[in-house]
């Protein structure tokens, strides 16, 4: 009886966890540093389809800091009031690398938003590597390149973002 009960528990546990990564939804929080003095933050909702391919709908904010003219350091005015952008967009993320407890996606998307003066359109290309943690949480590292149109001050933004994906309520 004890063997049958242990076998039944093992089968139920394995079958329940076998579909843990399929068709799941996650809330994503990421923050990173981009080339030429920029801090980037993204909040997103991600829907994962078959084979770790995913759709992401995101809100992105970026702050570009500069050294203060009066003190020569980075102060609150030179950080927060220098140059800011925000955007809302979508990205498709096909899976290109799969392994045990990790997978990698290309990230291809676009966005629309604004800086402090005018409209900005963005084209986003990058690579995201995901590491599965416990209870459906995921740690990700993202290398990104953003092309902002028609802005000449901040045309290309390249950098690295690190964040977490938190699972939503299961269906």
What are these regions (language model features)?
Residues 20-65, 165-171:
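Short glycine/proline- and aromatic-enriched beta-strand/turn motifs that initiate or cap beta-hairpins
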């Amino acid at each position: 009886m004890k063997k049958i009960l242990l076998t039944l528990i093992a089968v139920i546990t394995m079958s329940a966890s076998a579909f843990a990564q399929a068709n799941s939804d996650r809330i994503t929080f990421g923050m990173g540093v981009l080339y030429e003095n920029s801090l980037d933050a993204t909040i997103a909702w991600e829907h994962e389809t078959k084979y770790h391919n995913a759709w992401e709908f995101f809100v992105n904010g970026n702050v570009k800091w500069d050294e203060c003219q009066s003190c020569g350091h980075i102060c609150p005015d030179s950080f927060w009031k220098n140059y800011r952008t925000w955007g809302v967009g979508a990205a498709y993320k096909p899976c290109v690398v799969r392994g045990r407890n990790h997978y990698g996606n290309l990230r291809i998307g676009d966005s629309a938003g604004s800086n402090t003066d005018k409209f900005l359109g963005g084209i986003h290309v990058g690579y995201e590597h995901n590491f599965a943690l416990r209870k459906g949480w995921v740690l990700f590292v993202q290398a990104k390149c953003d092309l902002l149109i028609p802005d000449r001050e901040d045309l290309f933004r390249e950098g690295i973002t690190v964040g977490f994906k938190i699972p939503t309520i299961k269906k």
